[in-house]
Amino acid sequence: MLKTRIIPCVLLKNGQLVKSIEFKDFRTIGHLTSTMRIYNARNVDELIILDIDASKSGEIDFESIEDLAKECFMPLTIGGGIKTLEDIQKILNLGADKISINSKALEDMDFISKAANRFGSQCIVCSIDVKRKGGQFCVYDRGNLLEKSPLELALEYEKKGAGELLLTSVDFEGRAKGYDLELLKIFQNKLKIPLIINGGLSNPSDGVEALNLGADALAGAYIFHFSKYTPKDVKEELARQGFAVRLL
């Protein structure tokens, strides 16, 4: 049985690690080096870093990525601003284990296939941001709502060779009120690839609810920096509820 992963997912902005609320209202978490050391000490399963400056400017902060990778002793996923196979190669060469693509996948789905064929599906994470509009779930990209079904898009990504899906609820992101369970229900039992749910994790019980609706991994930021809970706390509750986790 595959073990459920607990994954801090934080943003890189101006050389600092930050968290946000609905992709705005940024709050600094800490310096790259010190934050990495905290994650290492807490034995988190993986770490996702999304470079939001690169997502806007297209200029990837390779220097910060290198600094992160040097201090990171867990599987590391890097996203933001990736446009070419050469970008992926450089990020992997700097020490990342996986890359996350969002806007580029929307623009050119064949890029997913090219990346998967060259580097292997196991290191290609496709990311979909979702926001509600009039009771419907829409794909959200760089401030725009797209008339696309998040589930249909995810299924297309899967066919193209994505190895995992990172699904983020923009409405719930940073709110610490639990995951968007209605969104998760749409995806329940629909994908063959692992689904990482992100946005809203506030306590271990939120994780239990998400896993019961088919999530394979739990991502979050607020809970691990601005609450009393640690990744170990979440894992211990999941283990009590019968989920397989990595406990040290």
UniProtKB/Swiss-Prot annotation:
MF term (GO), any: imidazoleglycerol-phosphate synthase activity
InterPro entries the record matches: Aldolase_TIM, Glycosyl_amidation-assoc_WbuZ, His_biosynth, HisF, IGPS_HisA/HisF, RibuloseP-bd_barrel
Reaction(s) this enzyme catalyzes, per UniProt: 5-[(5-phospho-1-deoxy-D-ribulos-1-ylimino)methylamino]-1-(5-phospho-beta-D-ribosyl)imidazole-4-carboxamide + L-glutamine = D-erythro-1-(imidazol-4-yl)glycerol 3-phosphate + 5-amino-1-(5-phospho-beta-D-ribosyl)imidazole-4-carboxamide + L-glutamate + H(+)
Protein name: Putative imidazole glycerol phosphate synthase subunit hisF2
Record key words, sorted: Amino-acid biosynthesis, Cytoplasm, Histidine biosynthesis, Lyase
Biological process according to GO: L-histidine biosynthetic process
A single cellular component GO annotation: cytoplasm
Domain of life the protein comes from: Bacteria
PANTHER family according to UniProt: IMIDAZOLE GLYCEROL PHOSPHATE SYNTHASE HISHF, IMIDAZOLE GLYCEROL PHOSPHATE SYNTHASE SUBUNIT HISF/H IGP SYNTHASE SUBUNIT HISF/H
Localization (cell): Cytoplasm
